[in-house]
Design a protein with these regions (language model features):
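C-terminal motif of bacterial Sec signal peptides marking the signal peptidase cleavage site
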Residues: 24-27
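Active-site metal-binding motif and surrounding structural segment of the metallo-beta-lactamase
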Residues: 53, 83-84, 95-143, 203
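Conserved beta-strand hairpin/beta-sheet module of binuclear metal-dependent hydrolase folds
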Residues: 55-108, 231-244
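Divalent metal-coordination and catalytic microenvironments
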Residues: 64, 79, 89, 104, ...
C-alpha cells in the first residue's frame, strides 16, 4: 500500500491472491466520523442534473435496436435479427444482465446468438455469463484479438491495486446519499454478483465482417479509451455502436484509477473513421442514444475537442513547458466549450494534459530538480528544520483546515505522515480536507475518489473482499496468467540463496516450472533438476490460488500429489504471500 494509505483488507490466511475486480465492501466502527450530506454548490447541482441522463429506460427504435440505459454504469444493446438476437456489451454483472434481459425478452424473446464486447472493461463484459448460460446452444463471444490479454492483466497481476483504486473512483463503498452518479452512468454494480466474463471465441485484428441471424455486421478496431476498443457498424441500418469512444461528458483521456497510456491521436483517428461512415444512429455504451443530424455534429465536436487538447499539449511541450505549467494554459475554445458532451463529468483537461505529456516523454518532465529528488521523508525533515520544528508544520495543517485551505492541508499532511507524526490526528485532518474538496467537486471521479479516501482515513474503517471467483470465471483465464501472478507475488525476503526449482505437471499435459533464484521467480518449462515435483489438475491449481480451496486440505486429501514433500510444497506456496 502507498505510505499514506491505511486500509485493512481482511482475507483468509490461505488466500494467495484474489481475482475479482472491484468487489469491495466497507465497514466502519461506531467511532467513525459521520458523513455529511451532499453540499449543493452550483457545480455540484450541474452534476445532479446530469443524473437525468441515467434514468433507467430501454430506448427502442424501428430498426430493431434497443438500448438499456441506466440499469448500471454501462448500456447494453440488443439488435433483433432473424430467429435470433445479438447483445452488444453485456452489462457490469450477471445480476444487471438478468435485469436488463427481463426487458429485452419482452420485446423479442428469440435466442441470443452472439455477445459482442466493445472492449475489455468489466462493465461491458462481466454480465456475459448470464447470456452464455441461458441455453444449451451457447452464443458466440466476439471481441478484438487483444481483449482477452487485457482482461487477464486486470484480473491478474494488477488486480489488487486496480481493485482498490477503482472502488474509490466509482465510490463503491460510499454511503448511498453521498453518491450522485459516476459521470457515465448511475453507479457501478459489479459487486452484486460473481464476475461473468466469458473468454471470446471469435476475434479479429483490424476488421471483421460477418452475418449473424441475418444481421450484416462490421467490426472495426478503434483505438481510444482502450487499446482493444472496437466499434460496431450495421450498414443496412446506418447504426453505429462506438463503445466507449464517445459519451456525454469530456472523455477520460486518462483515468485516475490507473491505466496504460491512452493513444489520444489514435482516438481522434477512430472517431474520424466513424464519421466517414455517415451514421444516422449513434448508440454509445454510456449515456443516451442519438439520431439524425445530431450524430455527425456530436462526433465532430468530440473529435475536435480531443485533437485540440492533444495538439496544444504537444505545442507547449515543444516550447519546453512542464506539465504543471501546461495545465494552467489549456482550456477548450469557446466555439465548442459549451457543448453538453464536453462537460468534465468524467475526464478532465488537466488530467489529460499530464497523461499526454507522459505518454510522449515518460515520467521525467525535464525539470532537473525532479530528476532524482530527495525522498519525501528527507524533504519533510528539511522543511521541519526550516520552520522551526515538526510541530509547526502540524500547526500550519490545523490552520489550513480551519481556513478551508484544504488542498494545502492535504499537501502538508503528506509531510507529517512521512515523518510518522501524530498519525491519528493528521489522518483526521486529512480526512476533513479530502471530504471538503470532494463535496465541492462536480467531477465524479475526483469527487468519489476524495470522499472514499476521506472515509478510509476514519477510525475503524475496513475493506473486505465480499466476492470470490467461481469455476466458470477461472476457466476463462489461461494458466500463464496464474503463473504470471505468482511471479509478481513473490516475497523476495523468503527466497533462499541457492536456486530452487519446482516442477508442475497438470492433468492436461501442461508442464510448468518455477525456479527461485536471485530474489525472482523464473517461469519456464524446464523439467531437469527439480527439487520438488507437483502433480494436480489445472482447475484445482487455479482454484487453490484464487482462494476457493485450502491447499493444506487438498494436499491432505491427496488431490495434490507432492511426491512425499507436502510440508515443503506448502512452505513454497507461502513465499508468494505478503
Amino acid at each position: 500500500m502507498p505510505y499514506n494509505t491505511y486500509i485493512h483488507m481482511n482475507t483468509k490466511s490461505y488466500h494467495f491472491f484474489l481475482l475479482p475486480l472491484i468487489f469491495l465492501l466497507s465497514s466502519c466502527s461506531d467511532e467513525a466520523i459521520s458523513q455529511p450530506k451532499i453540499e449543493f454548490t452550483s457545480s455540484v447541482e450541474k452534476l445532479v442534473e446530469h443524473t437525468k441522463e441515467f434514468i433507467p429506460k430501454v430506448y427502442s427504435y424501428d430498426n430493431g435496436i434497443h438500448v438499456a440505459v441506466g440499469f448500471g454504469i454501462a448500456n447494453s444493446i440488443m439488435v433483433e435479427g432473424e430467429g435470433g438476437n445479438i447483445i452488444i456489451d453485456a452489462a457490469d454483472s450477471v445480476y444487471e444482465a438478468e435485469k436488463i434481459y427481463s426487458y429485452f425478452k419482452e420485446i423479442n424473446s428469440n435466442p441470443i446468438k452472439a455477445v459482442i464486447y466493445t472492449h475489455n472493461h468489466g462493465d461491458h463484459t462481466f454480465g456475459a455469463a448470464y447470456y452464455y448460460n441461458l441455453s444449451e446452444e451457447k452464443p458466440k463471444i466476439i471481441a478484438h484479438e487483444t481483449t482477452a490479454y487485457y482482461m487477464e492483466r486486470i484480473l491478474g497481476i494488477l488486480n489488487p491495486i486496480i481493485s482498490v483504486r477503482s472502488s474509490r473512483m466509482f465510490g463503491t463503498f460510499l454511503p448511498e446519499e453521498q453518491l450522485i452518479n459516476v459521470g457515465i452512468g448511475p453507479f457501478l454494480g459489479v459487486s452484486q454478483s460473481v464476475p461473468g466474463y466469458i473468454k471470446p471465441d471469435i476475434t479479429f485484428a483490424d476488421e471483421l465482417k460477418l452475418s449473424i441471424a441475418g444481421i450484416d455486421i462490421e467490426l472495426h478496431h478503434a483505438i481510444g479509451e482502450t487499446n482493444d476498443q472496437l466499434f460496431v457498424w450495421l450498414p443496412q441500418r446506418k447504426a453505429l455502436m462506438p463503445g466507449d469512444n464517445i459519451y456525454k461528458t469530456f472523455p477520460n483521456l486518462y483515468t485516475i484509477r490507473g491505466t496504460t497510456h491512452r493513444d489520444v491521436k489514435g482516438w481522434v483517428d477512430s472517431l474520424d473513421h466513424m464519421r466517414s461512415l455517415d451514421p444516422e444512429f449513434l448508440f454509445p455504451s454510456h449515456t443516451k442514444p442519438l439520431e439524425g443530424d445530431e450524430v455527425m455534429a456530436t462526433l465532430t465536436i468530440y473529435r475536435d475537442a480531443i485533437q485540440y487538447v492533444h495538439d496544444q499539449t504537444i505545442r507547449l511541450m515543444n516550447q519546453g513547458l512542464y506539465p504543471d505549467q501546461i495545465i494552467e494554459l489549456i482550456e477548450l475554445p469557446k466555439e465548442i466549450a459549451d457543448s453538453p458532451f464536453l462537460n468534465e463529468f468524467y475526464g478532465t483537461i488537466r488530467w489529460s494534459v499530464k497523461s499526454i505529456f507522459n505518454g510522449y516523454l515518460g515520467w521525467f518532465n525535464g525539470n532537473i530538480a525532479e530528476l532524482d529528488p530527495l525522498s519525501r521523508k528527507d524533504e519533510a525533515l528539511r522543511l521541519s528544520d526550516m520552520v522551526g520544528g515538526i510541530e509547526n508544520i502540524y500547526l500550519q495543517l490545523e490552520m489550513a483546515v480551519e481556513t478551508n485551505d484544504m488542498q494545502w492541508a492535504l499537501q502538508l499532511s503528506d509531510h507529517l505522515i512521512a515523518l510518522d507524526y501524530k498519525i491519528k490526528d493528521v489522518n483526521k485532518l486529512r480526512s476533513q480536507a479530502a471530504d471538503y474538496i470532494g463535496q465541492r467537486s462536480s467531477n465524479p471521479n475526483k469527487r468519489n475518489y476524495l470522499l472514499s479516501s476521506a472515509l478510509e482515513l476514519q477510525p475503524g474503517f475496513e475493506l473486505e473482499n465480499i466476492l470470490t471467483s467461481d469455476s466458470l470465471l477461472l476457466e476463462q483465464l489461461s494458466m500463464d496468467n496464474f503463473f504470471n501472478i505468482l511471479s509478481v507475488r513473490l516475497n523476495p525476503d523468503a527466497v533462499e540463496a541457492d536456486p530452487y526449482r519446482v516442477c508442475f505437471k497438470f492433468d492436461s499435459g501442461l508442464i510448468k516450472t518455477i525456479t527461485l533464484r536471485n530474489k525472482i521467480a523464473e517461469i519456464s518449462s524446464i523439467t531437469t533438476n527439480c527439487d520438488l515435483n507437483i502433480e494436480l489438475a489445472d482447475d484445482l491449481f487455479k482454484e487453490v490460488l484464487a482462494g476457493l480451496h485450502n491447499p493444506i486440505r487438498k494436499v491432505a486429501a491427496g488431490d495434490i500429489n507432492t511426491n512425499g514433500k507436502s510440508a515443503e510444497f506448502l512452505i513454497f506456496l507461502s513465499k508468494f504471500r505478503d
